[in-house]
């Protein structure tokens, strides 16, 4: 909050006229000063800015929103939340009161404020005033260079550069030959020379002359390039360099004129430092970046998370002891935050006006406590407001203050508690209890989202399969019903065809039977006629027999016997021919039955082929296919 509220508070002080706080603020912001150097007679000495975190005197008012409801005994967070709060201009050091981390840092650096007792009669000590700068602002301008001088905030690396240059010069002395030194035409003994005289070297004079005529913005232009002055009339003399690549070239040159290049790097780097341009320290690679430290900063926090609520006592009873807020009442005042329990501190005089809200022992609980602490700080109801400019009453009701609890706070809370009545707590690592758990929660949420998406896809797939199954089941049901109807009709047709075939068989058998009966009747009639004819011939012969004539009798007997023989012979021929006819008939019947069986076989085969084509047409494929 200090970074946001500081400019606002400064504007208010300036508008109100001269105040001592303005002078202190100006002195606190003075991070750089210029002093004359004892070595070079007029060089600029760069002093790094140091942050001074100290409490200010800006005061703020807490405005309680008007409410038509009956006034309550305490003005809680609900009243200050929607109001126009001017107390947000408190000077708070660190990252601000918005998180527990900044509060822990502020509390650890303010031992005096924590060693006192938390009671309503405490008055904050006046802020410590820092002495003015020694000698004021030490401005000493040099002629001809003031218009190019700019003060920048950067680390003092001149000593490191000089040490590195000396080491490189020593190592280069072993590498350079006499020929190189002669060709350099350069006096290497420059320890007693000033910076100005080193710039007037015949190798560098023209280069630094053009460099001095440019401003810092022009020097840092990316399109501006130079030749290396140490490479004149030698290899690399035609190469162009920007400012920082030229400085890197002079630092890393390892062939001819090594010492001259190192001297150029030293003079150029020192000149850039004096003019306030950005310089890369010697030994670092051009284009290298530096980020935050690898080690994560950690600190101890109170566990379970707790928020101290101050100014919770109300009035004295008949025994001259203080009465205060109850547990449920305190929870109701902060019902928007997921606090689990509330406790109050009691002493010999009764309620001490100090209460605590206890949250869940998890990263979520710590975030809830930190959220309450941050919102109280935004409304100017935090630790600093309670310690420096507390307002016990606001709009006729008691104003509540709150902040994250520390070990010192809870020790004061337990000051008059013994045994089981003491509030138990532990000191845990912030990284271990909050950061790691939040990371684990984040990973679990990612896994949860992954499995949710996976489950959603599976549910969609299952729904599609279910719909497809319903459609296929309906088709199967209809197909089964159609097959049942077809089978029923086929069965009925088969029964009808069987009845017709049976009728045809019966008609056929009856017809054959009639034929056989007529045939048998004809054969019987034929035999009967043959017997009658024979009997007739025999009877006629017997009637014509005359006993008187033996010759005639013998003759008649011979005629009868010859007739009988002839008739028997004819009958034998008839029987033979009849048997031949029967055999021919049987053969014809066998041939006919054979043809009939073959026709039946062909019909069955054709029926199987037609049925197979029908099944293939309706999707019933063979497994071998």
From Swiss-Prot:
Residues 1-20, 30-148, 161-195 are annotated as: Disordered. It is found in: Cytoplasm, Perinuclear region; Cytoplasmic granule. Transmembrane segments: none annotated. One of its GO terms (cellular component) is cytoplasm. Residues 80-94 have a biased composition (Low complexity). Changing residue 500 to K: In sgs3-3; complete suppression of post-transcriptional gene silencing. Residues 452-533, 564-615 form a coiled coil. Keywords: Antiviral protein, Coiled coil, Cytoplasm, Host-virus interaction, Plant defense, RNA-mediated gene silencing, Stress response. The keyword Cytoplasm applies. The keyword Coiled coil applies. It holds the Pfam family zf-XS. Residues 161-188 have a biased composition (Acidic residues). Interacts with begomoviruses protein V2. Interacts with SGIP1 in cytoplasmic granules. Belongs to the SGS3 family. It comes from the Eukaryota. GO terms for molecular function: double-stranded RNA binding; molecular condensate scaffold activity; RISC complex binding; RNA binding; translation regulator activity; ubiquitin protein ligase binding. Disruption phenotype: Early flowering and bolting at room temperature (22 degrees Celsius), lost sensitivity to heat and accumulation of FT, associated with reduced levels of TAS1-siRNAs. Attenuated immunity leading to an increased susceptibility to the pathogenic bacteria Pst DC3000 (avrRpt2), with slightly reduced induction of ICS1 and salicylic acid (SA) levels upon pathogen infection. This is Protein SUPPRESSOR OF GENE SILENCING 3. Induction: Fades out in response to heat through an enhanced protein degradation (at protein level) triggered by the E3 ligase SGIP1-mediated ubiquitination. Residues 54-70 have a biased composition (Polar residues).
């Amino acid at each position: 909050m200090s970074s946001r509220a500081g400019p606002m508070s400064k504007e208010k002080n300036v508008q109100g006229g001269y105040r001592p706080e303005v002078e202190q603020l100006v002195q606190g912001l003075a991070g750089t000063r210029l002093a004359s150097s004892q070595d070079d007679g007029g060089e600029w000495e760069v002093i790094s800015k140091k942050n001074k975190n100290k409490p200010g005197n800006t005061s703020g008012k807490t405005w309680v929103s008007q409410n038509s409801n009956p006034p309550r005994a305490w003005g809680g967070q609900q009243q200050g939340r929607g109001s126009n709060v001017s107390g947000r201009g408190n000077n708070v050091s660190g990252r601000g009161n918005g998180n527990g981390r900044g509060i822990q840092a502020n509390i650890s650096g303010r031992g005096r404020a924590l060693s006192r007792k938390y009671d309503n009669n405490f008055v904050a000590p006046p802020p410590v005033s820092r002495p003015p700068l020694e000698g004021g602002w030490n401005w000493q301008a040099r002629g001809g260079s003031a218009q190019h001088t700019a003060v920048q905030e950067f680390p003092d690396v001149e000593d490191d550069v000089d040490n590195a240059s000396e080491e490189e010069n020593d190592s280069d002395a072993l590498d350079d030959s006499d020929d190189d030194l002669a060709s350099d035409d350069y006096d290497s003994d420059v320890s007693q020379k000033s910076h100005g005289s080193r710039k007037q070297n015949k190798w560098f004079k023209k280069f630094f002359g053009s460099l001095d005529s440019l401003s810092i913005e022009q020097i840092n232009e990316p399109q501006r390039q130079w030749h290396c002055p140490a490479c004149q009339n030698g290899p690399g003399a035609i190469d162009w360099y920007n400012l920082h690549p030229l400085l890197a070239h002079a630092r890393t040159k390892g062939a001819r004129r090594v010492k001259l290049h190192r001297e150029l790097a030293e003079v150029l780097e020192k000149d850039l430092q004096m003019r306030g341009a950005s310089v890369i320290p010697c030994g670092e690679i051009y284009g290298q970046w530096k980020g935050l430290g690898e080690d994560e900063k950690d600190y101890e926090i109170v566990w379970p998370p707790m928020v101290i609520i101050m100014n919770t006592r109300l009035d004295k009873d008949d025994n001259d002891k203080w009465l205060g807020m109850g547990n449920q009442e305190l929870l109701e005042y902060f019902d928007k935050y997921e606090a689990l329990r509330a406790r109050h501190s009691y002493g010999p005089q009764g309620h001490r006006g100090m209460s605590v809200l206890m949250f869940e022992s998890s990263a979520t609980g710590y975030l809830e406590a930190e959220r309450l602490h941050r919102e109280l700080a935004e409304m100017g109801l935090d630790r600093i407001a309670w310690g420096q400019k507390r307002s016990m009453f606001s709009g006729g009701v008691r104003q509540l203050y709150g902040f994250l609890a520390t070990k010192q706070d809870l020790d004061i809370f337990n000051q008059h508690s013994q045994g089981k009545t003491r509030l138990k707590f532990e000191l845990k690592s912030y990284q271990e209890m909050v950061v790691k758990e939040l990371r684990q929660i984040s990973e679990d949420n990612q896994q949860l989202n992954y499995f949710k998406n996976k489950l959603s896809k599976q549910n969609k797939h299952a729904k599609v399969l279910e719909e497809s199954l319903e459609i296929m089941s309906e088709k199967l049901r209809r197909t089964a019903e159609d097959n049942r109807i077809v089978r029923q009709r086929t069965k009925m047709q088969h029964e009808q065809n069987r009845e017709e075939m049976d009728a045809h068989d019966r008609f056929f058998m009856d017809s054959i039977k009639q034929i056989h009966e007529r045939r048998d009747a004809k054969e019987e009639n034929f035999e009967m006629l043959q017997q009658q004819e024979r009997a007739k011939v025999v009877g006629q012969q017997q009637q014509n027999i005359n006993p008187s004539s033996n010759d005639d009798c013998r003759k008649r007997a011979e005629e009868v016997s010859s007739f009988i023989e002839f008739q028997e012979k004819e009958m034998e021929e008839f029987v033979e021919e009849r048997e031949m006819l029967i055999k021919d008939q049987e053969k014809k019947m066998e041939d006919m039955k054979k043809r009939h069986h073959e026709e039946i076989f062909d019909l069955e085969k054709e029926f199987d082929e037609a049925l197979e084509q029908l099944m293939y047409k309706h999707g019933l494929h063979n497994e071998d296919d």
